[in-house]
C-alpha cells in the first residue's frame, strides 16, 4: 500500500466508537455518489472514512528494465492524483475534515484486480462498512453493479454499503432504517444489524416485505389476477412474518419505534415503488442462503431489490 456483537440495548450505553467506513474510489469515476453517501452517514453520527483506490496493473515491469524509472514516476504521480481526487470528492460532499481517518485518509495500491485489495484494505482499517459507488450506466437514484461490486457482493466478509447514482439524500443524515425481512436466518442477521443501527441513531426501524404480483417473482407473458385469493393470502403471510420480526427487534431494543410495510405491485419494480421512500432511508438486507458463513452473497431476489431500490442499501453478511 502507498499511504497518503450481539448485545441487548441496555449494554449500548457506553460511548460508541465512530463507525469506520472504507470508501472504494475509482480514478475514472464520473460521479461522486460514494463520497455523497459517506458524507450523508457522517451527518448521522461521527464517522471515520478512508478512501481506497486500486490502480489496475496489466503486467509487471522488472526493476532493471529501461522503462522502470518512467513507470515508477508515473505510479507516484497517479497515486497522488488519485488520493487528491478522492479527498476532494469527500470534501465537496461535505464530509468534515475531522472525519477523515487520522492516519492515511487515502490509500492507493496497484494490483491486477480490485476485490482482494479492497477486502484487505477494509480489514487493515477495521472498517464497519465497505462503501461502493454505482456503475455509471445506472439510472439516476438507482444502483447497477460493475465487475468489482459483483465480486464483492459474493464474497465480502463485512457489510457492503451501496451508493445509487446521483442519490437524493436527506440533509440531516439517515432518518429511518428500513429492513427487508422474510423471517429466514439470513434476514434475522439483517434485522439484528438494522435494529442496532436504528437504536444507535435514535431513528425508527421499518420492516418491509415485497410481494411482486404474478405467479412468479418476475414479469410473465400471461397476466396473473392481483386480486385473487392467493395474493390476499400472500399479503397476510407477509404481515404475519413482519409481526414476528417486530417482536425480534423489540426484544433486542425495547424502546425502538418499529413500523411495518408491505409493498405489492407488478414485478419487483412495482412492489418496491409501491412503498413510500424518504431521502433519509437506508435499506438493510441480508445475504442469500447460498453464501459462505460470514460472507456476503446475493441471490436473485436480493439482486432485483438492489436494481430497483431508490435509496442506499447495506448488504449484511450472514
Question: Where are these predicted regions, by residue range?
Answer:
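Extended, non-globular alpha-helical segments
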Residues: 2-13, 148-167, 225
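Small/aliphatic-rich secondary-structure junction motif
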Residues: 4-70, 95-98, 102-103, 175-228, ...
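A short acidic, glycine-rich active-site loop
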Residues: 69-82, 227-240
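Charged docking surfaces used in two-component/phosphorelay signaling
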Residues: 102-117, 261-270
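Glycine-rich phosphate-binding loop signature in dinucleotide/nucleotide-binding domains
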Residues: 121-127, 276-280
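Glycine-rich, Arg-bearing micro-motifs that act as flexible, cationic patches
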Residues: 129-151, 174, 282-308
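Short beta-strand elements of ligand-binding domains
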Residues: 131-134, 159-166, 313-317
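Protein-protein interaction modules outside structured cores
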Residues: 236, 262-273, 279-318
Amino acid at each position: 500500500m502507498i499511504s497518503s456483537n450481539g448485545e441487548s440495548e441496555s449494554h449500548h450505553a457506553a460511548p460508541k466508537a465512530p463507525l469506520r467506513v472504507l470508501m472504494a474510489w475509482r480514478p475514472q469515476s464520473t460521479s461522486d455518489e460514494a463520497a455523497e453517501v459517506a458524507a450523508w452517514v457522517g451527518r448521522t453520527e461521527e464517522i471515520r472514512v478512508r478512501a481506497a483506490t486500486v490502480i489496475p496493473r496489466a503486467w509487471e515491469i522488472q526493476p532493471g528494465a529501461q522503462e522502470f524509472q518512467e513507470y515508477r514516476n508515473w505510479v507516484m504521480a497517479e497515486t497522488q492524483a488519485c488520493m487528491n481526487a478522492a479527498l476532494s470528492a469527500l470534501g465537496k460532499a461535505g464530509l468534515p475534515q475531522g472525519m477523515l481517518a487520522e492516519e492515511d485518509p487515502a490509500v492507493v495500491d496497484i494490483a491486477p484486480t480490485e476485490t482482494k485489495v479492497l477486502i484487505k484494505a477494509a480489514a487493515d482499517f477495521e472498517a464497519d462498512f465497505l462503501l461502493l459507488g454505482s456503475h455509471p450506466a445506472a439510472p439516476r437514484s438507482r444502483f447497477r453493479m460493475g465487475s468489482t461490486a459483483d465480486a464483492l457482493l459474493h464474497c465480502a466478509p463485512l457489510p457492503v454499503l451501496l451508493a445509487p447514482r446521483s442519490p437524493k439524500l436527506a440533509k440531516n443524515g439517515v432518518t429511518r432504517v428500513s429492513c427487508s425481512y422474510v423471517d429466514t436466518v439470513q434476514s434475522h442477521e439483517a434485522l439484528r444489524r438494522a435494529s442496532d443501527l436504528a437504536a444507535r441513531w435514535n431513528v425508527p426501524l421499518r420492516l418491509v416485505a415485497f410481494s411482486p404480483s404474478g405467479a412468479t417473482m418476475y414479469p410473465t407473458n400471461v397476466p396473473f389476477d392481483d386480486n385473487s385469493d392467493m395474493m390476499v393470502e400472500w399479503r397476510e403471510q407477509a404481515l404475519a412474518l413482519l409481526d414476528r420480526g417486530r417482536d425480534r427487534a423489540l426484544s433486542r431494543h425495547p424502546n425502538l419505534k418499529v413500523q411495518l410495510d408491505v409493498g405489492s405491485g407488478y414485478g419487483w419494480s412495482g412492489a418496491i415503488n409501491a412503498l413510500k421512500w424518504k431521502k433519509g432511508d437506508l435499506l438493510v438486507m441480508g445475504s442469500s442462503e447460498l453464501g459462505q458463513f460470514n460472507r456476503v452473497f446475493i441471490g436473485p431476489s436480493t439482486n432485483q431489490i438492489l436494481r430497483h431500490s431508490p435509496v442506499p442499501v447495506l448488504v449484511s453478511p450472514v
